[in-house]
Amino acid sequence: KRLDRIKTTFAAFKFDWKADCDHVLTAIAVKKYNNPELSWKVQREAYKLLEGRAGCRLQKRLENLRIRMFWKRVPNEEIDKMTKMDIIAADKRLTEIFINIIREMALKYDV
């Protein structure tokens, strides 16, 4: 049973990796905190791991993106919608590292 779960975890994240990551993070929140609404805590943990492993600062990248969008006269509604996940999606290296972190977290918390 555990081997099947490991296979499923590593086979996931092919088509819509953002939705898959969100699903896994919510499942970890349920397992760890018994509350799916606390998935933001798990997401914060994943971001910290990503920043450490990739040697990047997501918040600074997000601020820089918002400044560039402002100078390109992008509407404020679109600027406000930008998230750290958008930063990760824009960089293939960060995307791969983040997916691997989520896989490791899924195995760690047995989700």
Feature roles, as predicted:
Residues K1-V111:
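Positively charged, phosphate-engaging catalytic surfaces used for nucleic-acid and nucleotide handling
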